[in-house]
């Protein structure tokens, strides 16, 4: 239950080798990008981080195992960051998005930022990151650069969706 209509604007499919770490990704608010994520084949350790400045849970993270056995899914509201770690070769993640991909509005925070402290189930030397993700700023650097959404702005945006 999202509290508002989830208008799907784009569907993405990502296939990853074991050890591939993708994220932490997020889009500028508004409109940001809500996501509904599931793992079609294989398994991934899926992580959501609250990056909304001023939120009572700012900087906190939670995780769920998404796989082709239990068929769990996760919904990410606008203003949150997302990452996943492929635990098996050919792990396929499908995500439905509320806004189309807009590269100029997309940002990253390093998924290995010690200040966030995500407990990845593989040792750091086994993690494989893209160039973009490896060069991502820390949460503090992204905040100082004004890239992060605020709690107030995200709440106002979600409320505007409820009134539609």
Put a short name on every predicted segment.
Residues 1-72, 90, 102-164:
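Non-catalytic, conserved peripheral segments adjacent to functional cores
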Residues 78-97:
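Ligand-binding loop in jelly-roll beta-barrel domains
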């Amino acid at each position: 239950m999202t509290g508002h209509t989830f208008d799907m604007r784009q569907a993405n499919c990502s296939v990853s080798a074991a050890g591939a770490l993708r994220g932490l990704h997020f889009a500028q608010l508004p409109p940001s990008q809500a996501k509904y994520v599931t793992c079609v084949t294989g398994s991934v350790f899926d992580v959501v981080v609250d990056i909304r400045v001023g939120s009572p849970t700012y900087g906190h993270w939670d995780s769920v195992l998404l796989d082709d056995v239990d068929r769990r899914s996760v919904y990410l509201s606008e203003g949150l960051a997302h990452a996943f770690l492929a635990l098996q070769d050919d792990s396929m993640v499908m995500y439905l998005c509320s806004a189309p991909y807009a590269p100029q509005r997309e940002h990253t925070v390093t998924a290995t930022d010690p200040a966030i402290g995500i407990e990845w189930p593989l040792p750091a030397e086994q993690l494989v990151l893209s160039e973009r993700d490896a060069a991502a700023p820390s949460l503090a650097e992204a905040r100082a650069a004004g890239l992060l959404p605020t709690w107030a702005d995200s709440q106002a945006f979600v409320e505007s969706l409820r009134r539609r």
